[in-house]
Amino acid sequence: MSFEFTIIVPVYNEEDNLERVEKELLAYSKIATKNTCILFVNDGSKDKSQAIIEAICERNNNFNYISFESNKGLSAAIKAGFDYASTALVGYIDSDLQTNPEDFNLLLEHIGEFDLVTGVRANRKDSFVKNMSSKIANGIRRSFTHDGMDDTGCPLKVIKADFAKRIPMFKGLHRFLPAMILLQEGKVIQIPVRHYPRIAGQAKFGLWNRLLGPLSDCFAYLWMKRKYINYKVAKHDL
């Protein structure tokens, strides 16, 4: 089977969630509007995640993995997924499954016209502190990037791979994916998706990661925006 769409699943110490991830993504792949494969990126997990991932990939032909030597963070895991994917479309979902894989089909409806389609979590099922810190962080980021996105941290996105592979990722830049597509003169849109409470495992981001960390990342983004090279080839004979 020729795959058209790769779902990247970053994993860090998610042993309690992975069998549910397998079940949900396997079910989604049967109803997906594009031929879909799954790529786990094990971000240096210290629990049994790697052994579980290998077992999942052994019994499913459309599941593969890469595994880091040590923990490098979510941005690195997403970047590695972009680099290793061989399909025309890439997307990602968190391994906590607080978003529904079936909603990828909602995003795929728009990927022909847009270069990045991101979910925006409707009726978020997180704590008051987490919701408020995310809203404040999104407001700060939006004032820097002017990307018009309300929920750039939503872990459900679809991107054309030729755009994704040109993103010069740095730590924290996963929050700026729509803005980085706009720097390439691409088109972005946000679509409401479902959101659920975390069932197992522990959240990897605290108040610092959600609020204070992104503020410093905004200045890194502004530096990159000034230095970013975006060229278009008019002609070639390659």
Give, region by region, the residue ranges found by the protein language model:
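Hydrophobic helical membrane-anchoring modules
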Residues: 1-3, 139, 146-147, 170-238
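Short, flexible, basic/aromatic active-site loop/helix in glycosyltransferases
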Residues: 114-165, 216-220
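Short, hinge-like loop/turn segments at secondary-structure boundaries
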Residues: 82-84, 108-109, 133-138, 206-209
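Residue-level signature of the cytosolic catalytic core of signaling kinases
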Residues: 45, 70, 125, 129, ...
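Structured catalytic core of nucleotide-sugar glycosyltransferases
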Residues: 1-128, 162, 183, 188-191, ...
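Short Gly/charged-rich anion-binding patches and loops
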Residues: 48, 159, 176
